[in-house]
Each structure stands twice: as C-alpha cells, then as structure tokens.
C-alpha cells in the first residue's frame, strides 16, 4: 500500500513539474532550441522568439547569464514615467548577468518581436522577476 501511494505521489509531482517551470517564464516567449554549452559545465544556451502585442507588458527581470539578440519587428514601447520610445527593427539586445532590464509596455502600432539567445546557468529559472 505504501509503495502504491509513493508511486502516485511521484507521478503527480512529475505531472506538475512542467506547470511550475512555465510559471517562471514569459507567456509571450516561444523556445526554439536549448543545448548545453560545451566546455562550460553547468551552462546552457537557449534561443527564443517573443512576440508582444500592443498592451502587453514585459515586467522588469534579470537572467542568470547573458542575453543577446535583436529586434525582429519594432514597435513603440513605454517605460513607467517616461515618454514612448521606438524599439526599432534591427536594434541589438545585450543584457548582462543579473542586471535588471525590461519593465515596459508595448503601445504599438504593431507587435514587437524579439529574437534572443540566453547563455545562462543550467537549472536556474530563465527569468527572475524584479519589483
């Protein structure tokens, strides 16, 4: 009986693990590929595309590693207390380890599309949200 209950518990935990991992992610992000970084134990490289519609917000956050990428499709964005500014197509993205960034709202006119590559600590959440 104890073995059966243990098996049910393990199955329930395994089922819920993806839900917990997704709760730490951005709903606008679609992961394209994830691989271990050769020659650097404990590091991985993750490529993603994120699409934000007008009205979507990207909360302030940081990563446990470096984020690089570019703006595929630009849009106007607004940081709290700041006038709107353009994130232009082709603009580079480079955010250093543990440095908070983001915190803007997309105001349009179209969607903002970002391609990013994260080189981060394996096993840590990709995003840590910052208040």
What are these regions (language model features)?
Residues 33-65, 107:
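N-terminal targeting signals for Sec/Tat export/insertion, comprising classic cleavable signal peptides
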Residues 37, 52-53, 81-99:
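Short acidic-glycine-tyrosine-enriched beta hairpin
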Residues 64-82, 91:
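Glycine- and acidic-residue-biased ligand/ion/polar-headgroup-sensing regions
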Residues 99-124:
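Ligand-binding loop in jelly-roll beta-barrel domains
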